[in-house]
């Protein structure tokens, strides 16, 4: 050992007192009998105590001081550096916690000792060191890193055979204030004497007899996990107190004894309380000082035992402490090995404690067992001792057998109870399974129902989609059909209008010729009518231009119609048409109140174009009752009045009035009046009458021919079918126009007729009711009675068709309060064909030009597009 430099006398004295003993100072146990084999050299001495150094890391501090410990490359020599020098200690191994965890430390130094215990050896592992050096942490570990206790149990029981032969018996003892307590058992009486420490009242105190604790309880098993959990739980019952040196300082020694009865092995794990200074620990009070004194007493007693054995003294003071009494077998048994783990701190503040710990370990390492030490088992020198040992083992085995039998009975009882509980649980499980089966069946049924419902839903959805597609297709076809029908109707109306224009031109030509003028000389009525429809603009706008282009006075002719009977037509017209000064010949022929007007459109100040439907004013045919004209020269040409031979003058006037109303040429009438005034003085009354009769006869012939073409008798129609005119009437005093003409079978009812009318109205359908038969202005027919009323019971119209009069329902009754107006009505009435209805005279005298086919095409008003300015 290198000399330590010293600057003071005190330092020399200190190092002299703690000098490590050398080999020459070791004392060997001499044999009482000489060696039988004296010729052979003695075997090398055996070291029963192995010392390992475990250096903990620094505490959790912000500033770490340099370490005072330094390990050589052989990992067996530790050098402690100080300001005045250094000192070396030789150990069997050194481990730093910063470099090696508990697992590496266990595999490197402890695992081989545990393997020896499994084959029957005895081993004692002691944790020695000052408080706060990490002894309990190395022994028991923590949650993340298990300690030596758990790893030892795992190695002993982990590789056991499948039969489960290997098991251990574990005893946990506590040495506190030089008293031994059993941590596995508790005292329920709780009548301990005064002065017992707090926390020890529930523990059982034991006595030492024959180097063992008498009546100590133990736990046995084959599972390392369960046993280690139990050990950790009872270890928490140790006396622990917080001091200035350690926040959780153990105030007692803990001894864990693991016996392996099958092989006779034993493992003793000793976690010693840390030696400490009373002043440094800050212990105050009698009890605290007694705890520290007793802890130091046990440590000092163990130190004396080690020194005595190392020095070879004849007397070893095992009885100085309860701890050394329990460890006596570990030091005296030849098969026992001691592993002493020295826990130290590298902190310079703990240098004095570190030196004391290393000196204690170096002293224990000097213990040797020489070759001359008698081996009682080997040579059989002491049979009595071996017999005692065998007897103790047999007794232990007997006790163990008895305990196993009692445990077996207890386990059988527990097994029976467990079987009963198992049967109950099985019954409950069976009931739950049956219930689960029922619910699964219900769930299956519900799933089947859901599947069926889904299938039905999909089927209905597909059918609905098909129906919707079919309805859409039918609607498109219906719209297309209506569009075509409207186009055909427009074309037909245009053709009829063209035909009427030609007829009117012919009438104009004939009229001019009859007056002695040429066709080319006059450009009045015919040219204006031709120019009216030759352009693309609507006719009504042209009529407005005609009225406002050349304003001339319009004369209203008022006259009286004679109600006296006459045998000839000429005498009748002679009395009716008396020429007056400054009056036109045509105005003389219209004594009724006639005023031809044009509907002017108001311009609205807006930003987009609108279509306004302008309806011509309905032509009201006003006739006065006339006596029948019995002329033999005229035939029955009127289809509505077969009794008269020739039309009256009033009927002819109304026919011409309708023609002029169609054209809307009010100014032309005044021009003709002016021209005829000039010719009134030249032509005689007889010549005027002849000319007038020639023109009216030709117009009458054309009208009769047209009426014969359009009016087809009922006999000429198809067998079994009827024609029905549908008329819309908002109120009794406000008659409207014909809607349409329907053809039905003879056995049809009003209900069938309603369906056809609703189909015709389409999306603009409006509630309506039929008026009672024969009473167009009377009460209404109930809807539920329509299926019982035949269509043949409707009144005849013009002798060849039936008339059905409709009236709006309750939702549209308020329209009856509105005055009759040619302005646009509701959407349904605007869609209807505009047909002027004439009031029928008592004699049913109707003009040929008022037939439905002609009037329907002449009275429709074209659309007029007004551009907003």
UniProtKB/Swiss-Prot annotation:
Keywords: ATP-binding, Coiled coil, Cytoplasm, Cytoskeleton, Microtubule, Motor protein, Nucleotide-binding. Residues 1-50 are annotated as: Disordered. One of its GO terms (cellular component) is microtubule. The keyword Coiled coil applies. GO terms for molecular function: ATP binding; microtubule binding; microtubule motor activity. GO terms for biological process: plus-end directed microtubule sliding; vesicle transport along microtubule. It holds the Pfam family Kinesin. Residues 48-367 form the Kinesin motor domain. The keyword Metal-binding does not apply. It is found in: Cytoplasm; Cytoplasm, Cytoskeleton, Phragmoplast. Residues 393-515 form a coiled coil. Its main location: cytoplasm. ATP binds at residues 129-136. Residues 38-50 have a biased composition (Basic and acidic residues). InterPro entries: Kinesin-like_fam, Kinesin_motor_dom, Kinesin_motor_dom_sf, P-loop_NTPase. Residues 1-36 have a biased composition (Polar residues). Binds microtubules. Belongs to the TRAFAC class myosin-kinesin ATPase superfamily. Kinesin family. KIN-10 subfamily. Probable plus end-directed motor protein that may contribute to the transport of Golgi-derived vesicles in the phragmoplast. This is Kinesin-like protein KIN-10A. It comes from Arabidopsis thaliana.
């Amino acid at each position: 050992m290198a000399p330590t430099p010293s600057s003071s006398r005190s330092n020399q004295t200190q190092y002299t007192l703690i000098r490590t003993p050398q080999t020459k100072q070791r004392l060997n146990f001499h044999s009482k009998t000489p060696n039988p084999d004296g010729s052979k050299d003695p075997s090398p001495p055996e070291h029963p105590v192995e010392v390992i150094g475990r250096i903990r890391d620094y505490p959790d501090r912000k500033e770490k001081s340099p370490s005072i410990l330094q390990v050589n490359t052989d990992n067996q020599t530790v050098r402690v550096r100080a300001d005045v020098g250094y000192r070396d200690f030789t150990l069997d191994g050194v481990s730093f916690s910063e470099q090696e965890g508990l697992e590496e430390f266990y595999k490197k130094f402890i695992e081989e000792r545990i393997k020896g215990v499994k084959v029957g050896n005895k081993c004692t592992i002691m944790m020695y060191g000052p408080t706060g050096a990490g002894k309990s942490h190395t022994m028991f570990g923590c949650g993340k890193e298990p300690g030596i206790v758990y790893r030892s149990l795992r190695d002993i029981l982990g590789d056991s055979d499948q039969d489960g032969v290997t098991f251990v018996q574990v005893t946990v003892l506590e040495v506190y204030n030089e008293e031994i307590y059993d941590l596995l058992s508790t005292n329920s009486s709780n009548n301990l004497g005064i002065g017992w420490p707090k926390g020890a009242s529930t523990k059982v105190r034991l006595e030492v007899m024959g180097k063992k604790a008498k009546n100590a309880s133990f736990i046995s098993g084959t599972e390392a996990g369960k046993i280690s959990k139990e050990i950790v739980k009872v270890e928490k019952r140790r006396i622990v107190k917080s001091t200035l040196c350690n926040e959780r300082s153990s105030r007692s020694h803990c001894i864990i004894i693991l016996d392996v009865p099958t092989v006779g092995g034993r493992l003793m794990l000793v976690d010693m309380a840390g030696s400490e200074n009373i002043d440094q620990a800050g212990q105050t009070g009698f009890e605290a000082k007694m705890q520290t004194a007793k802890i130091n007493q046990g440590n000092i007693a163990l130190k004396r035992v080690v020194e005595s054995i190392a020095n070879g003294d004849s007397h070893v003071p095992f009885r100085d402490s309860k701890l050394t009494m329990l460890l006596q077998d570990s030091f005296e048994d030849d098969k026992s090995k001691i592993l002493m783990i020295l826990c130290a701190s590298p902190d310079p503040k703990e240098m004095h404690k570190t030196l004391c710990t290393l000196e204690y370990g170096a002293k224990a390492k000097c213990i040797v067992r020489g070759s001359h030490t008698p081996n009682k088992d080997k040579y059989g020198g002491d049979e009595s001792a071996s017999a005692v040992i065998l007897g103790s083992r047999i007794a232990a085995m007997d006790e163990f057998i008895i305990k196993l039998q009692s445990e077996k009975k207890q386990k059988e009882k527990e097994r029976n109870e467990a079987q009963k509980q198992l049967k109950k649980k099985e019954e409950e499980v069976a009931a739950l399974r049956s219930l689960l089966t029922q619910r699964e069946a219900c769930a299956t049924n519900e799933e089947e129902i859901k599947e069926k419902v889904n299938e039905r839903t999909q089927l209905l959805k597909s059918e609905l989609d098909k129906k919707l597609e079919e309805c859409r297709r039918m609607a498109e076809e219906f719209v297309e059909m209506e569009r075509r029908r409207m186009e055909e109707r427009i074309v037909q109306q245009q053709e009829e209008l063209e035909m009427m224009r030609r007829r009117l031109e012919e009438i104009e030509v004939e009229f001019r010729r009859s007056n002695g003028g040429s066709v080319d000389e006059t450009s009045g009525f015919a040219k204006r009518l031709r120019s009216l429809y030759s352009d693309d603009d609507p006719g009504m706008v042209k009529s407005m231009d005609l009225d406002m282009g050349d304003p001339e006075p319009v004369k209203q002719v008022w006259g009286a119609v004679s109600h006296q009977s006459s045998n000839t037509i000429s005498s009748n017209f002679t009395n009716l048409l008396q020429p007056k000064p400054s009056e036109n010949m045509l105005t003389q022929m219209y004594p009724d109140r006639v005023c031809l007007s044009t509907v002017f459109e108001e311009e609205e100040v807006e930003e987009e174009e609108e279509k306004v439907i302008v309806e011509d004013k309905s032509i009201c045919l006003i006739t006065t009752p006339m006596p029948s004209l019995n002329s033999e020269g005229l035939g029955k040409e009127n289809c509505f009045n077969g009794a008269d031979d020739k039309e009256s003058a009033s009927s002819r006037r109304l026919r011409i009035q309708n023609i002029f109303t169609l054209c809307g040429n009010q100014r032309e009438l005044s021009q003709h009046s002016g021209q005829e005034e000039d010719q009134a003085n030249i032509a005689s009354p007889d010549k005027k009458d002849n000319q007038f009769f020639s023109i009216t006869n030709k117009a009458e012939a054309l009208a009769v021919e047209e009426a014969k073409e359009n009016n087809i008798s009922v006999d000429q129609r198809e067998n079994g079918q009827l024609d029905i005119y549908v008329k819309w009437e908002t109120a009794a005093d406000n008659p409207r126009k014909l809607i349409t003409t329907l053809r039905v079978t003879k056995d049809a009812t009003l209900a069938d007729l309603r369906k056809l009318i609703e189909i015709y109205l389409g999306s603009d359908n409006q509630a309506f009711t039929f008026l009672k038969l024969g009473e167009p202005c009377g009460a209404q027919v109930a809807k539920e009675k329509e299926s019982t009323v035949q269509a043949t019971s409707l009144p005849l119209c013009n002798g060849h068709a039936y008339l059905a009069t409709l009236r709006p329902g309750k939702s549209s009754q308020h329209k009856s309060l509105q005055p009759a107006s040619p302005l646009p009505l509701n959407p349904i009435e605007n869609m209807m064909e505009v047909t002027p209805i004439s009031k029928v005279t008592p004699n049913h005298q109707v003009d040929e030009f008022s037939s439905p086919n002609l009037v329907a095409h002449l009275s429709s008003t074209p659309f007029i597009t007004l551009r907003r300015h």
